């Protein structure tokens, strides 16, 4: 491997150390309802995001709270020597994609049937460490 490739690979590896992922697949909530909660915590610091999710009444907030705690644990596993409070973690990216649909039939008048689409979603959460903040 050349010198430039090795240096670039080391830079990418260092950048990945500051980032932690968590993914929730096939969550049985519609993507529209999940995006409402995801928009509230996007870009927020981890502590504030946890408080927002904890005190929200929506069902999607419980699932997102567990996902955020999992992402924090993933970051701690990557950076065992770093302190969680000093790192100033924030929600760098949160993405809600549509998952598979369960199609069901509901009886309708005059012998017809209406299709019910029970939607699911996939949520990807990326945490970033904000060590060099501009105040």
From Swiss-Prot:
Query: What are the entry keywords?
Result: Ribonucleoprotein, Ribosomal protein, RNA-binding, rRNA-binding
Recorded hits in InterPro entries, A to Z, give: Ribosomal_uL22, Ribosomal_uL22_bac/chlpt-type, Ribosomal_uL22_bac/org-type, Ribosomal_uL22_sf
**Which Gene3D superfamilies is this protein grouped with?**
Ribosomal protein L22/L17
Q: Any idea which GO molecular function terms this record carries?
A: rRNA binding; structural constituent of ribosome
Quote the SUPFAM superfamilies the UniProt record gives.
Ribosomal protein L22
Mention one GO biological process in which this protein takes part, according to its record: translation
One cellular component term (GO) for this entry is: cytosolic large ribosomal subunit
The record's similarity note reads: Belongs to the universal ribosomal protein uL22 family.
**NCBIfam families, from UniProt?**
rplV_bact (TIGR01044)
Subunit note: Part of the 50S ribosomal subunit.
- Function in brief: This protein binds specifically to 23S rRNA; its binding is stimulated by other ribosomal proteins, e.g. L4, L17, and L20. It is important during the early stages of 50S assembly. It makes multiple contacts with different domains of the 23S rRNA in the assembled 50S subunit and ribosome. The globular domain of the protein is located near the polypeptide exit tunnel on the outside of the subunit, while an extended beta-hairpin is found that lines the wall of the exit tunnel in the center of the 70S ribosome.
Protein known as: Large ribosomal subunit protein uL22
Query: What is the taxonomic lineage of the source species?
Result: Bacteria, Pseudomonadati, Bacteroidota, Flavobacteriia, Flavobacteriales
What gene name is listed for this protein? rplV
